[in-house]
Structures are given as C-alpha cells and as structure tokens.
C-alpha cells in the first residue's frame, strides 16, 4: 500500500511539472510579425492630422520606459560650468554651442517599431551662465519634443505572433533655455513651474 501511494504521488508530481512546463513554453512562443516594416509603411501612408492628434492625447512625453535602453552616440554628458567653456569651433554642432547643450543617444525599445530612435538628452538642468557659478534661478533647460509615428506592441499574441498598434512617440529633439513659469495661485505647484514638454 505504501509503495502504491508513493508511486501515485510521483505520477501526480510529474504530471504537474509537465503541465507547468507546457504552460511556460506556450507563454514564450511568440515572435515578431514578418511584415512589421510593411505595417509601419502603411501606417505612415494613411496617417492624417486628425488621427495624429488622437494618438497624441494618449501619448506620454518625457521619462524612459522600464525596458528601454540608451546608448550614447554623439557628444558627452558634461554640463559646461559657464559659457566660456562652450566651444567656439565653427565646425561644431549647434547643440554643442547652445546655452542648453545636449547629447544624442540611440534609444532602443524592443516593443516599439522602429526599435531604435535617435534622441537628444539635456546636459544641464539650468541654462549655462555667463560666469562660473552664475546659474540663474529664473531660467532652466527644457526638452523640446516632436511627435513621431511608431507602432507599439499591444501585449497580445495571436497565433504565435505579437500584435502591434499605431501610436505616437514624443521624440526629444533638443533642449532650449526658457524662463521659469510662475505657479498659479492655489495650484500647489512649486517655483519650477510647468513640466509640460515644449512642442516643435
């Protein structure tokens, strides 16, 4: 009797392991669509101003997705201490000579198409001052965004293929020096003012 009970329990445990393994395997067997580039081309061809505005209402700007990876591709992350530290080389790029300098990164997100998008990142939080340690409390650097059309993975897997839907990504194009806005009375905002992105 004891041996039979042990044998029965062994069968139950093995069955559970096989079942769980099958569930795990079925959960990961999902691949990218083979026509993803074609889907994107069709989306770009059919996009209009009205549906762009519709997508914009549900899009978010600023911040980085938890699974998004960035690689520095041009420039450096060092914020100049004063305008004297900014290059005057005529061959230099505008974003190296601005009072809100920025660098370029390759943003990679596996659940988006195109998966790699080149974006700007601000080097400084405040505008570069004329003199050393002369940062003003009246100005700051803010990102400048431009909406770009993308396809975003929905999370659904149909017949082993990931599903994508039209979306809009707020691409950071650069940084600009702006005067800080004053908090509205009763808004509860701090002295830094609005953090809304600046559209291009």
UniProtKB/Swiss-Prot annotation:
Recorded superkingdom: Eukaryota
Name the UniProt record assigns to this protein: Interleukin 17-like protein
Ranges in a coiled coil: none
GO cellular component term, pick one: extracellular region
Keyword hit for Oxidoreductase: no
Cited Pfam families: IL17
The organism of origin for this protein: Magallana gigas
Protein's cellular compartments: Secreted
Tissue expression profile of the protein: Expressed in several tissues including hemocytes, gills, mantle, adductor muscle, labial palps, digestive glands and heart with highest levels in gills and lowest levels in adductor muscle and heart.
């Amino acid at each position: 009797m004891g041996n039979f009970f042990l044998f029965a329990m062994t069968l139950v445990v093995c069955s559970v392991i096989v079942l769980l393994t099958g569930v795990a395997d079925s959960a990961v067997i999902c691949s990218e669509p083979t026509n993803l580039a074609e889907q994107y081309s069709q989306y770009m061809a059919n996009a209009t101003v009205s549906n762009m505005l519709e997508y914009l209402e549900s899009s978010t700007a600023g911040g980085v997705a938890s699974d998004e990876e960035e690689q520095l591709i041009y420039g450096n992350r060092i914020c100049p201490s004063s305008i004297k530290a900014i290059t005057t080389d005529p061959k230099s790029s505008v974003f190296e000579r601005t009072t809100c300098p920025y660098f370029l990164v390759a943003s990679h997100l596996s659940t988006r198409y195109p998966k790699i998008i080149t974006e700007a990142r601000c080097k400084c939080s405040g505008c570069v001052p004329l003199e050393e340690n002369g940062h003003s409390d009246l100005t700051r650097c803010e990102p400048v965004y431009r909406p770009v059309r993308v396809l975003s993975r929905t999370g659904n897997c149909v017949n082993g293929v990931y599903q994508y839907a039209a979306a809009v990504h707020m691409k950071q194009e650069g940084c600009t020096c702006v005067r800080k806005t004053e908090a509205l009375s009763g808004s509860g905002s701090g002295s830094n003012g609005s953090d809304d992105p600046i559209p291009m």
